[in-house]
Amino acid sequence: MGIDPGAANLGFGVVRIEGSRMVALDGGVVETSPELPIERRIERIHRELSELIEWHEPKAMALEDLYFGKNVHSAMAVGRASGAAMLAAAQRGVRCFTYTPQAIKKAVCGSGAAGKDQVQRMVGTLLGLPEPPTPDHAADALAVAICHGGYAPREAVAANGTPAVGGLAG
């Protein structure tokens, strides 16, 4: 399960690895109104992600790492949404991993400097979708899931006691 964290629009995407390819199972956005108090928005994110986790039973949750720009208020809201997602995962025994935006773009497009449109198109191509996924928050979450899926075999090796090649952020 991939997560594109945000307090107003949190993207989620669920993929399954089938042999050498990935298949999209679900994707969408948890929307909250900016008119609601932040605690109500975070509660809704937690509740809806908890339901999605119970439904899909993911083996892992991968989140886009917080990018700290100039807007501290926005960064705090994204951090709170990430925390709600991680709590929902932890309460159901699902391990969480984080990836930088550059690592996600590189995993999906081959370049950490890829634009949003390029990521959206590549997500559609990699998942065999007839069109690029929308909205963009859902596409970004699917990109996070694809990124983690590319690293998942390394995690399995590391879990068996053999050092992983490369590494997972976590």
Language-model features, listed with the residues they occupy:
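Phosphate- and other anionic-substrate recognition elements at nucleic-acid/protein interfaces
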Residues: 1-170
